[in-house]
Amino acid sequence: MRLCSIASGSSGNCIYVGSEATHLLVDVGISGKKAEAGLNSLGLTGRDLDGILVTHEHMDHVAGLGVMARKYEVPIYATTGTLEEIQKMGNLGRINPALFREVKEDVKLTIKDLTVNPMKISHDAAQPVGYRIAYGDKKVGICTDLGVYNDYTVECLKGMDALLLEANHDVKMLQVGPYPYYLKQRILGARGHLSNENSGKLLCRILHDKLQAIVLGHLSKENNLPELAYEAVRMEITMGENPYRAEDFRMMVADRSNVSPVINIA
């Protein structure tokens, strides 16, 4: 099983998860051309895709969805609320409704040899979800765009072998930054985005011996830095009430606009 961030940041997100036989993208919030280039770097093309899992309808998650769907007739998996919003978005171009596949929170579905299990998240979108994807007993979690987490979130993300988790902003950078007040409040709110520190606190509750890799994703260009995100999360893990140190795990920050190193989950 492989996990690879093709791009992850507040300006565009596209994550690859696959096995030898099945190839999925989680979101296409970048251009179709860039998504294809990312697939090419993995030895794949758009024709190899078995599905696109959409977390929610914001443009940094769906900008290239229409292009990829039309060119390759790839099935699109999303919640009812998200699919309804996508169909209203004129800037994506027409997408054949026959490609739409409805998913429901906490209801598993099978795409060839992968099992997909959507999970609820708290974000200001119609019906947003994160995804847990399993190949046999190996599991990957993709969880970004959540303003808060709770016991449900923790239970959903326990037992992952690899996890891509949001570390969107440094609170101090956001507070003194150029964003207008209403936008700062949105980001800091319960339906906004997870800060570096809260990302680390969430991780402290789900770490386990068999966790192979942690990828910090969806960093804000204006309100975060890769080194800040990494260090804040590292400190939360090391100083938190858990038996681990950050150095016990492979941890990286996903690149905003370039393909990140591939994580092979064995």
Residue positions per predicted region:
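Cap/insert and terminal regions of metallo-dependent hydrolase folds
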Residues: 151-252
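Metallo-beta-lactamase
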Residues: 80-130, 135-137
